[in-house]
Amino acid sequence: MIIVNDYIDDIFNDFKEYLDNQKKLCELKEEAYFYGNHIPNYDKLCVQQLYLLRYAYAYIYEYMEMYSYMFNYFYQNKVNYNGWRILSVGVGAGLDLYSLDLCNNFIDNNINYTGIDVIDWNYRPKNIPKVSFCFYNLDLETLVNDNNEIYSKIIFFPKSIGEFTEDDLKLLPTKIKSDKIYLMISFAFDKDRSKLKTLLESFENNGFVYTILSNREKIDKENKVELHNKYKIDAYPQDIKNFIYRLNDCCNEVSICYDIIDCDNKLSRYPTETDINFNYIIIEIQRI
């Protein structure tokens, strides 16, 4: 079973090697930043590393909460899910597969997991007990426009649905071959919920009905909970937390930077270690 803090440590050690060879961090600042419709350039290893150091800890436990809910629902409703197929769309580093590993006690037999992403991410799982898995360099557009058929019973969007076009999402239900599936979507931003509306309308137009099983919206700051308290787990490593927060100190040219405030805003931020960004929905979809 994954030890999340060991995973964070491994990424941090690699990231430090990258930083040791950089005189300035201007490129990292611009390539790794979310703003407007700009998505970080995940083709670059350093961007993957910084993204995971900031968000992997919280995302793994958010997805664990989602899978735990799903498996408990199956147990209560006597649903036999052994041997099921899971499709993770926009899988990235496979964080939801690590989350599945944390739910290992729910899995009696083999589950088949497929992750697709246009980018071949590093830091993906190498071995997960009771789960057969594979990753493909593939985007949703190719999946829904080629002669593909989807037999997966669970379709997971890990913070990724906002990255896909409405046209591609509309085609997804036409590829579904199972009579009942479960849609699990974690939203990176509240505005991404509009993409869900498009997807659900397409399911209805293609002969499906849906039932919302769980809907967790983003909470206010005053209601956030530290994940290590919530789940009785190790806290995010303090030394790495402090380092990431003062990342701009690693820039050798920070003293002559023309826009130090911009550097602070884009580089210097704490990793997420609370449930403040938990924002997801789980839906049962049935063919009629």
Q: PLM features: what roles do these ranges have?
A:
Residues N122-C134:
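Short, conserved SAM-binding/catalytic segment
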Residues I2-I3, N137-I288:
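Domain-level detector for long C-terminal conserved domains
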Residues N82-G92:
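Conserved class I S-adenosyl-L-methionine
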Residues N112-D117:
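Conserved SAM-binding motif I beta-strand of class I
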Residues A93-D108:
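Conserved SAM-binding loop of SAM-dependent methyltransferases across substrates and taxa
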Residues L52-Y67, G92-D96, D120-N122, T165:
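Phosphate/oxyanion-binding active-site loops and adjacent basic polyanion-contact surfaces
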Residues M1-F34:
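N-terminal auxiliary segments of SAM/dcSAM-dependent transferases
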Residues N37-N77:
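Class I SAM-dependent methyltransferase Rossmann-like catalytic core
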